[in-house]
């Protein structure tokens, strides 16, 4: 079991390193659609590996073994996982569970606050201009998505620049970017090694909206100029809620540089490399599952009894 767990851990670390690098060489939409489910799957693999390690120690406790068919003596004899490693895995799993539940409760509270504060202002899909001196524009989460622009920013923009901002924010709503980002944050909450991947996903989401805006207004230079100008105008703190998607989010200089270049091309090598890492992660996690099952099968008193009376 030790080798299976070691392989799974190496695969998880490899994904955590490779994913942000691959994200730079994929189109923003593809990067988001690939990295988010891959991150969630890797986080799930992390939980499974920790659980499998913890189970080897928990299964030796008489109170737990009473609910199963295995022998604590046989399990202890067959278990290759040192007790300190298993106990540490249980502690990490417990802390991760508590932290994730706390994170989830805070995000639900924030989502409800966004809905409470903005849903009554105007029908879904419309543009709301807030009377605020803060320069900002953001989109509330779909399906009840709304584009919010402060009066300070709205008045400072030209009509064409307003079109860019609205196209950018509507892209966030149309493609449910808030939910993609939340899923990535969930994964990195479970496994902190995935935080760089979550940051790459946030950048990809903003770039995705930039590319959509460039398609809608048919002028990449205008989009780049609008993003840069909006960032310069934003001299104060944002007024938008934490769960909103803003036009000035992400790495603004990098976004501007990308818009001044041709649309991103497909990079099959990055896609293939990431898929290979994902396949290895899945295979090693399955290996941990099979090894763990075999370990408990060895300790199963019923199976041992059958083998004793029916030798091969």
What are these model-predicted stretches?
Residues 26-49, 97, 107-274:
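Membrane-embedded and juxtamembrane structural elements of multi-pass membrane proteins
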Residues 1-22, 181, 191-195, 199:
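Alpha-helical transmembrane segments and their immediate interhelical/interface regions
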Residues 30, 63-69, 115-120, 295-305:
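Juxtamembrane extracytosolic/periplasmic "stalk" immediately C-terminal to the first targeting helix
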Residues 65-67, 178-182, 288:
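Short C-terminal domain-edge/linker segments immediately following a structured domain
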